[in-house]
Amino acid sequence: MTHIQPRPCQLTSPMPSGRYKPFVPHKLPDRTWPDKTLGDAPRWLSTDLRDGNQALVDPMTPARKMRMFELLVGMGYKEIEIGFPSASQTDFDFVRQVIESGIVPDDVTISVLTQAREDLIECTMQSLVGAHRATIHMYNAVAELFRRVVFNIDEKQCICLLYTSDAADDTPCV
């Protein structure tokens, strides 16, 4: 019977690891968050009502979206993204329907999505008039292909979009 020699856990390496100093952790006595643990459930935000580009051919009907909104509320969601009102009249109308129908419970925050363009921000703000509580998810796509193909803008124009968020300051209803 041949005796097999165990291999060491890690083979020696030709890399000059001795040249490098070991990691020295920073001592930050006022930093307490690493010792904290989660005691409550996280806040979940449903984005199920925003169809997105994948549904341009066959989007959800307003009636189906309304049933889904009621289902999400029934499941206990406290934050629900209900649409992209500046992207289509259908989404704008659905946002208005949700607000005007009064079906949003007091403890639920509705959310909408918009691109960071002044005209689209204004349209989005108008869709939310009368909402008890709402958030706006504003984005600015910075990927070169997305800028060029979808938005037809260059990098300089994309940077200029950063300064359009001031439009929200003029609408205190949201």
Regions found by a protein language model. Name each.
Residues 35-57, 137-151:
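N-terminal small/glycine-rich loop or linker at the start of catalytic domains
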Residues 163-170:
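Conserved small/polar residues in nucleotide/adenosyl-binding loops
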